[in-house]
């Protein structure tokens, strides 16, 4: 089972504040474990524009018509000072990895320099931090009914309002997440 380019959808019973009602986009899943970004937990009052200002990135070809008020996401509890840009495929960045035909992840500064210009990726989201699982940990959490899984949908990833992503991801499975009991029973 490889869950790269899948969503993990937190079950209602998951009460950990870092992951309660979260949707995680799995960027990598292999023999050594898994890595993903929470895509529905905004960092209050932190926008892409704020990040660019803090890093003193100012492009001379900045187009004022391109909005930079996108909220930055809390990607997970690990390395919360490290930025990740999830975006539609576009070549030419120093540290980019293809996740799927529709998505790439970049961690290099050069992608930030394109933001607000005609050279920026068509679709993107910016996250600080990430979530990871050691070998076998995610599989055990799935067996323990911590997460639902479904193949990722780029419309949910890039275009669905943040507050609606948890339900939208569950809808892909034909589930109204609000109708699931928060406790699991055993017969």
From Swiss-Prot:
InterPro entries: AlgH-like. HAMAP family: UPF0301. Gene3D superfamilies: VC0467-like, VC0467-like domains. Transmembrane segments: none annotated. NCBIfam families: PRK00228.1-1. One of its GO terms (cellular component) is cytosol. Belongs to the UPF0301 (AlgH) family. PANTHER family: UNCHARACTERIZED PROTEIN YQGE, UPF0301 PROTEIN YQGE. This is UPF0301 protein YPO0936/y3322/YP_3506. It comes from Yersinia pestis. It comes from the Bacteria.
């Amino acid at each position: 089972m490889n869950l790269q380019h899948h969503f993990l959808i937190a079950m209602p019973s998951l009460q950990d504040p870092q992951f309660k009602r979260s949707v995680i986009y799995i960027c990598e899943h292999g023999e050594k474990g898994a890595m993903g970004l929470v895509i529905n937990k905004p960092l209050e009052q932190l926008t892409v524009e704020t990040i660019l200002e803090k890093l003193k990135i100012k492009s001379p070809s900045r187009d004022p018509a391109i909005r930079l008020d996108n909220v930055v996401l809390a990607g997970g509890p690990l390395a919360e000072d490290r930025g990740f840009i999830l975006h539609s495929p576009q070549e030419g960045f120093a540290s980019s990895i293809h996740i799927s035909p529709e998505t790439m992840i970049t961690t290099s500064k050069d992608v930030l320099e394109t933001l607000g210009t005609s050279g920026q990726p068509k679709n993107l989201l910016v996250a600080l931090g990430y979530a990871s699982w050691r070998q076998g940990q995610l599989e055990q959490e799935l067996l323990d009914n911590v997460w639902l899984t479904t193949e990722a949908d780029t419309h949910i990833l890039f275009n669905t309002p943040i507050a609606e992503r948890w339900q939208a991801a569950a809808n892909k499975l034909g589930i109204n997440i609000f109708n699931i009991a928060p406790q699991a029973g055993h017969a």
